Amino acid sequence: MSSEHIQNKLALLPDQPGCYLMKDRQGTIIYVGKAKVLKNRVRSYFSGTHDSKTQRLVQEIVDFEYIVTSSNVEALLLEINLIKKHDPRFNIRLKDDKTYPFIKITNERHPRLIITRQVKKDKGKYFGPYPNVYAANEVKRILDRLYPLRKCSTLPNKVCLYYHLGQCLAPCVFDVEASKYKEMQDEIVAFLNGGYKTVKNDLMKKMQEAAENMEFEKAGEFRDQINAIETTMEKQKMTMNDFVDRDVFGYAIDKGWMCVQVFFIRQGKLIERDVSQFPFYNDADEDFLTFIGQFYQKANHIPPKEIYLPDDVDSEAVQAVVPDTKIIVPQRGNKKELVKLAYKNAKIALNEKFMLLERNEERTVGAVERLGEAMGIPTPSRVEAFDNSNIHGTDPVSAMVTFLDGKPSKNDYRKYKIKTVEGPDDYATMREVIRRRYWRVLKEGLPMPDLILIDGGKGQIDSAKDVLTNELGLDIPVAGLAKDDKHRTSQLLFGDPLEIVPLERNSQEFYLLQRMQDEVHRFAITFHRQLRSKTGFQSILDGIPGVGPGRKKKLLKHFGSMKKLKEASVEEIKEAGVPLNVAEEVHKHITAFNEKAKNTEQK
């Protein structure tokens, strides 16, 4: 990644705690770190002088990403999970085989309170993890003084010092009722789950009394215990005190784009996250449901035991997509905070996307020249980019945006309602739009572009070139922008025969193309949404006898997505709770629609 782009990303770092992941040229995570203030810590790598070890790391960094947390403690706990997950080579010397400590109440006849680094399914009660052994021991010391559980690993023949200090009930000598242990365990659980505040208040009173009595050493001990409680009892939303596998979803929307963040919690720990950004076409909640349906179709996305969702999501529809998973819409507590944190990270990522685009807008003149050189054409000072937008062929539209010297010229943007094409025929749509646009350019003597960019591949490019050359007699370079499976700009296609133009993905030229494609896509989507709001969205279920709004909603809820409904048999449609004759009509209608779309695509 270019130094300039790194600087742009550094300028957008938040004043919040979190973890950062440094990547090399291959996109491999080479170092994971934590920070109380992400902005200050990450920037420090790219300024000032460093020792030789740090300098070697910095020389290999070409990109970075970060995860915002709610506290420094969470950043600390998340860091260890990320290091275990990615095993970055620059972290290896700092890593050992130990994990973070937990406080455990053992499942024994005479239970003990111990510190352990291994969490087992042994019916013991575990609390943590804690940032370090010192902090865990400080809390245990407080608990030992408050709750006299046994301290010895094996019972001695006589009472020990702990009994005389009032910190053990001496089960080695006396018969201690199970109910007494149960009472102490309940109080310890309450303490470690928030009741520590009452204990802290009692300690503060004792500290004040000791100070008033000139017992400063004793007051200092109380002070240290209070500080230990405050630093270690902070809520830890990034880790759950169980072994349940969960996926936590949050999403944010802006300018026709959606960002979805998924936190993968495995064995109770946040170990990874997925970030997806894409334009959305329908209502945000509907497209989010579609995303979830597609998400769990991927081989490496196995549905977990639980899924946490935001408030405005149709949980019943999600349940239909992953029937064996428990769907939860948290209303309070740590689970709710996790969903909020996923949303917070999605919003930050989306804002960063647009801010980076705006900052790059000021630095594109050189990129325009280098783009022309890479393509073997004169500098494309005027670029006109096209994109088509429709849903199942309804209300098809196209849009054109113009970039002058690498900057958008919004006065030259154009919108087109498709007039001559029926159904989802992208090639015919492209032919119509190119014909209308450049016939008008010729007629009115408007400026000709130096380059035409098409959102698509060979079929769309050939359609545009055929109209320009054979119908209008124009010789304008036409290139295509292909996308990957995450709807991100992937490659530039140009030439005869078509070839991939070799551009570095982290070059300014590539960012310029990405911005052009994003902008024309946004413009087309916005126009399409405005048009649909006036005419009403015509679903492929509209017009089917016996399928009104209620049954339409029932079908979509049952199948989770239009894609699954399209693949359903008559019997499967009937299982959604509709009569057989209606199921047959739906199947007949969808089959005809699919066949029409298939024939159009083959043409």
Curated annotation (Swiss-Prot):
This is UvrABC system protein C. It comes from the Bacteria. It comes from Listeria innocua serovar 6a (strain ATCC BAA-680 / CLIP 11262). Residues 15-92 form the GIY-YIG domain. Its main location: cytoplasm. Belongs to the UvrC family. PANTHER family: UVRABC SYSTEM PROTEIN C (PTHR30562:SF1), UVRC/OXIDOREDUCTASE (PTHR30562). One of its GO terms (biological process) is SOS response. InterPro entries: DisA/LigA_HHH, GIY-YIG_endonuc, GIY-YIG_endonuc_sf, GIY-YIG_UvrC_Cho, RuvA_2-like, UVR_dom, UVR_dom_sf, UvrABC_protein_C. The UvrABC repair system catalyzes the recognition and processing of DNA lesions. UvrC both incises the 5' and 3' sides of the lesion. The N-terminal half is responsible for the 3' incision and the C-terminal half is responsible for the 5' incision. The keyword RNA-binding does not apply. Interacts with UvrB in an incision complex. Residues 197-232 form the UVR domain. SMART domains: GIYc. GO terms for cellular component: cytoplasm; excinuclease repair complex.
